[in-house]
A protein has these predicted regions:
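A glycine-biased, small/acidic residue-tolerant capping/turn segment at secondary-structure junctions
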Residues: 701-718
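Extended, well-ordered protein cores
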Residues: 2-270, 279-502, 507, 511-529, ...
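Ligand-binding pocket scaffold of soluble enzyme catalytic domains
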Residues: 674-677
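Short active-site loop/helix that positions an aromatic residue
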Residues: 275-276
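C-terminal accessory extensions/subdomains outside the catalytic/core fold
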Residues: 720-741
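Short, charged, amphipathic alpha-helical segments
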Residues: 683-691
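Membrane-interacting alpha-helical segments
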Residues: 679-682, 706
Length: 741
C-alpha cells in the first residue's frame, strides 16, 4: 500500500521492462518487507502520462494522478530514492497509436491535432507535445550522471565475449557531416553576469518584431548559447552525400536523435526524405499536401496517408517510390524482410544506439538484400559526429576490439536541470522568414543574435552554474575513487565548450586533485586517447556534456559488453536523493512482439538488479538502515553468481526467459541472505526460503518454461491488462507460493 513517504519508488514504464516488472517487483517487495523498506510504484508509462494529462476528458474512475510531476518534485528532496526503468520516448506515430488504443478502451481522449486551427486544438496539441519525445528523463534528472560497468558485469564479458565483427583496413564506411552552416559552425556562447530574464524574438527584414518565447529567468553565471542550422546548406549536403553514396556503392544511412531532439531532428529527417525521394515529391507533392502528409514523420507517413486513395492511384505512388531505388543509393534497412528503410520512421534509427551497432558490426549496416554492407553514416551537425569517425579510423587501423582484454570507459555526465542541447526544445524554432533571432535581456540588450533565412533551425541552450560545479566535483570524486585518468571532452574551438573550459579550470582548484590525472581534450582527441588506452586494457573516465553522456554510455558499453543495458547508472541528485536508472538501453519493442507471438520474454533484468542494489545501498547510507546494506551486499553477490552461472534469458522459446532469470536471482539472493553472518534475523528468515527454492528448482523452471510457446495475451500494448499480464508473467504456482508467503 502507498504510504506518505515511500522509501523506494519503482517506476512502471513501457514495453519489455514493464512486462518484466510484473514478475520481478513481487520478488523485490517480498525480500525487502521484513527490513522496514517500502517499495512503492508510480506509473510514468506513455499511457499513464496521457491519461494523467487529460482529466477533464475522462470519467472520475478513469482519472489518475500526474506521477511524473510528483516524481519531479520528489527528485528535489533528500528523501528521493527512485528506480527508473526505460520508458518510451514517443514519436508522433507512437503517440497516436497509444491515443487510439486508449480511445478503444473507453477513454474519451481527443485526437492529436497535427495542424491545429482553433485555440482548443492548439491547447490539446501543446498538452500532447509535452508527453512526446524524451519527456520523462529531464524531469527526474535533478543531478549529474555516473555511469559505469560494474565489476561483475565486466568480468562476465571478459569470460564470455560477445561477437565483434572483423574490420578491414579498406572498409569504405565513414561518417559524413556538413562543412559549415551547421549548429557547430554558427554557435555563439556567453556566461551571464548577474541574474536576469531574457526573451527570444525574431526581427524581420522589414524591422517588425515577433516574440518567439516570452521572458524566462537566467541565473548568475549561467552559460547560454545560440546556433543555427541552415536549411539551404542542409539540403545541399543531403544532395551531395546521396550522390556520393551512389558513386562509392555504399549504403546510405541517416543517424539522428528524433526522440530527444523532438523539435529539430524530425525536421532534418524530413529534409533527407524529401531529397532522397525528390522525384516522388516533385510529381505528387501537391497531392501529399492535400492528404496532410507530414514528411517529418518519415516515408511511413506517405504510406499511411495514401491508404485512403483509390487502389490504382495508391499503386501508382507505391510504384513511383519503388522506382526511386533504381536510381538512388541503397538505403540502410531497419527491417529488410518488411522493406522498412532508415527513412521510414524518424524514431527507428537513433544515433546513440545505431552508430555503436554499426561499429560493432564491422562498420556495416543491413542492406535491402538482407546482407551487411559498408555504409555512409550521415550525421549532419559536426558537434559530436567526429567521435564516430575516430572509432572507424581506429578500427580500420587496429582491427576490432577484443572484449576479453579491453579496458572500460565509465562516464561522468553533465545532465542536471536540463543541461545543454537536451533542454533546448522550448527554445528551438523553425523560422518561416528571413531576419534575425535575438536573445534579449530585461534592459533590452541583445545577448546573442543569429541571422536566419526561411526554414533555418534556431536553437538556444543553457546550463546552470551549480550543475557545472557539481559535475566537476563528481569527476574528481570518481577519479579519486578509481585512480584512473579523467578526461573532460571539451573543444576550445567550440563556443559553448570554451565557456565550460573556463569554469572547469576555475572549479578544479576547489578540490584536492593531488596525484590525479585530469585532462581537457577536444572530443575527437579524447576519443582517440580513450580508444588507445581501452585497446591496452586500461580504463579512462570520460567527463562530458549531456549529449556525449548519452552517446558514450551506449558506444563504449556496446563495444565492451555487447549492450548498454548492463550499465550501472546512478544519478546522485543535487539535493541529496538518488535516482537509479536501469541500464542505458531502450524499452525493446521487439521483445514484446515475441511475447505476443510465443510468450517468451528475452528482456534481461540485469540493469534492474544493479539499480536495486545501488538504491538499497543509498538507503542504508542516508537513513542508516543496516538491513538495507545487507540486502544490497547479498544482492550484489547473487548477481555475480547469476552471471557466472549464465542464467540470463535466452532468445529461444522454451528455454529460460526473463521469468526464469528472476527465479534464479531469487534463489541466489535468498541463499546469500541465508549464508551471511551480519544480520541473524535475515539469515533465519531466508534459510527456509533458500531451501524451498533450491529443492523446487526443477519443478519451478519446468512450470516457467512450459508456459511458453503460445500467444501471450497482454490485453493491450500501451495500456496493459493488470490481471492478464500478472498471470502471464507469474505462471509458476510453486514459485509464487514461496515468494508470496
Amino acid at each position: 500500500m502507498p504510504t506518505e513517504k515511500p522509501t523506494i519508488i519503482y517506476t512502471i514504464t513501457d514495453e519489455a521492462p514493464a512486462l518484466a516488472t510484473y514478475s520481478l517487483l513481487p520478488i523485490i517487495q517480498s525480500f525487502t518487507a521484513s527490513s522496514g523498506i517500502n517499495v512503492d510504484t508510480r506509473d510514468i508509462s506513455l499511457a499513464g502520462r496521457i491519461i494523467a494529462n487529460f482529466p477533464e476528458h475522462l470519467k472520475e474512475e478513469q482519472r489518475i494522478g500526474d506521477a511524473l510531476t510528483e516524481l519531479g518534485e520528489l527528485a528535489q528532496t533528500p528523501e528521493a530514492n527512485i528506480i527508473k526503468l526505460p520508458n518510451i520516448s514517443a514519436s508522433i506515430p507512437q503517440l497516436k497509436a497509444a491515443i487510439k488504443e486508449l480511445q478503444a478502451k473507453g477513454y474519451d481522449l481527443p485526437n492529436y491535432p497535427e495542424e491545429p486551427s482553433t485555440y482548443e486544438e492548439k491547447a490539446i496539441k501543446s498538452a500532447y507535445d509535452k508527453i512526446k519525445g524524451s519527456a520523462v528523463n529531464p524531469v527526474l534528472r535533478e543531478g549529474n550522471s555516473d555511469r559505469r560497468a560494474p565489476l561483475s558485469v565486466k568480468n562476465y564479458a571478459k569470460k564470455n565475449p560477445h561477437s565483434m565483427g572483423a574490420w578491414s583496413s579498406d572498409s569504405k564506411s565513414h561518417v559524413s557531416s556538413m562543412a559549415g552552416d551547421d549548429f557547430f559552425g554558427s554557435e555563439k556562447s556567453t556566461t551571464i553576469s548577474g541574474a536576469t530574464e531574457v526573451k527570444i524574438e525574431f526581427v524581420g527584414a522589414d524591422g517588425s518584431v515577433k516574440e518567439l518565447k516570452s521572458a524566462f529567468p537566467l541565473l548568475d553565471k549561467e552559460v547560454i548559447d545560440s546556433s543555427v542550422l541552415k536549411k539551404k546548406a542542409l539540403v545541399e549536403f543531403f544532395e551531395k552525400e546521396i550522390a556520393d553514396a551512389k558513386e562509392q556503392d555504399v549504403l546510405l544511412s541517416l543517424h539522428m536523435k528524433a526522440t530527444m531532439m523532438k523539435v529539430s531532428d524530425p525536421v532534418i529527417f524530413g529534409h533527407a526524405v524529401k531529397v532522397y525521394y525528390k522525384d516522388v515529391f516533385a510529381k505528387y507533392g501537391k497531392l501529399f499536401e492535400e492528404l496532410g502528409v507530414d514528411v517529418n514523420n518519415g516515408l511511413g507517413d506517405v504510406y499511411s496517408k495514401i491508404e485512403s486513395l483509390p487502389a490504382a492511384q495508391k499503386e501508382e505512388i507505391e510504384a513511383a517510390i519503388q522506382a526511386v531505388y533504381q536510381t538512388q543509393p541503397e538505403l540502410a534497412m531497419v527491417d529488410s524482410d518488411r522493406g522498412i528503410t532508415n527513412l521510414h520512421v524518424p524514431s527507428d534509427i537513433i544515433v546513440d544506439a545505431s552508430m555503436p551497432a554499426m561499429l560493432r558490426s564491422s562498420g556495416q549496416m543491413w542492406g535491402p538484400d538482407g546482407k551487411q554492407k559498408d555504409t555512409k553514416a550521415m550525421i549532419p551537425d559536426r558537434c559530436y559526429a567526429g567521435i564516430y569517425q575516430a572509432v572507424i579510423d581506429f578500427c580500420k587501423e587496429h582491427g576490432a576490439f577484443d572484449p576479453t582484454t579491453m579496458g572500460s570507459v565509465p562516464n561522468v555526465g553533465l545532465m542536471a536541470q536540463k543541461a545543454e542541447e537536451y533542454g533546448s526544445h522550448d527554445k528551438t524554432f523553425i523560422l518561416d522568414a528571413a531576419g534575425t533571432v535575438r536573445v534579449v535581456d530585461a534592459s533590452g540588450t541583445a545577448l546573442l543574435e543569429q541571422a536566419v533565412e526561411e526554414g533555418d533551425i534556431f536553437r538556444m541552450c543553457q546550463v546552470k552554474d551549480a550543475p557545472i560545479q557539481d559535475w566537476v566535483k563528481l569527476a574528481v570524486t570518481r577519479a579519486r575513487a578509481t585512480g584512473v585518468p579523467a578526461v573532460f571532452w571539451l573543444d576550445e574551438n567550440r563556443a559553448h565548450d570554451a565557456e565550460l573550459i573556463k569554469k572547469v579550470n576555475a572549479y578544479l582548484p576547489d578540490h584536492d586533485t593531488t596525484g590525479l590525472e585530469i585532462k581537457i581534450l577536444a572530443p575527437v582527441e579524447a576519443c582517440k586517447y580513450s580508444l588507445e588506452r581501452m585497446k591496452a586494457g586500461l580504463d579512462t573516465i570520460s567527463v562530458t556534456g549531456n549529449v556525449l553522456r548519452d552517446y558514450l554510455t551506449d558506444l563504449f558499453p556496446i563495444l565492451e559488453l555487447g549492450t548498454s543495458a548492463k550499465m550501472l547508472s546512478i544519478v546522485p541528485l543535487m539535493n541529496g536523493g538518488g535516482l537509479f536508472e536501469t541500464g542505458a538501453g531502450g524499452s525493446a519493442p521487439k521483445h514484446v512482439q515475441q511475447v505476443e507471438k510465443e510468450n517468451h520474454l528475452r528482456w534481461d533484468s540485469l540493469g534492474e538488479f544493479l539499480a536495486l542494489a545501488a538504491s538499497l545501498e543509498h538507503l542504508s547510507s542516508v537513513i542508516g538502515n543496516a538491513k538495507a546494506q545487507v540486502l544490497a551486499d547479498t544482492l550484489d553477490k547473487a548477481t555475480g553468481e547469476f552471471l557466472d552461472k549464465n542464467k540470463s534469458p535466452s532468445r529461444k522459446v522454451g528455454e529460460l526467459d526473463n521469468r526464469g532469470s528472476h527465479f534464479y536471482l531469487a534463489l541466489y539472493w535468498a541463499k546469500a541472505l541465508a549464508e551471511q553472518t551480519v544480520d541473524a534475523d535475515l539469515a533465519t528468515e531466508f534459510a527456509p526460503i533458500a531451501k524451498s527454492l533450491a529443492e523446487q528448482e526443477e519443478k519451478i523452471v519446468a512450470e516457467l518454461n512450459s508456459a511458453q510457446g503460445v500467444k501471450g495475451e497482454l490485453g493491450g500494448y500501451y495500456l496493459l491488462d493488470d490481471v492478464l499480464v500478472s498471470k502471464l508473467m507469474r505462471p509458476s504456482e510453486t514459485f509464487n507460493a514461496i515468494i508470496d508467503k
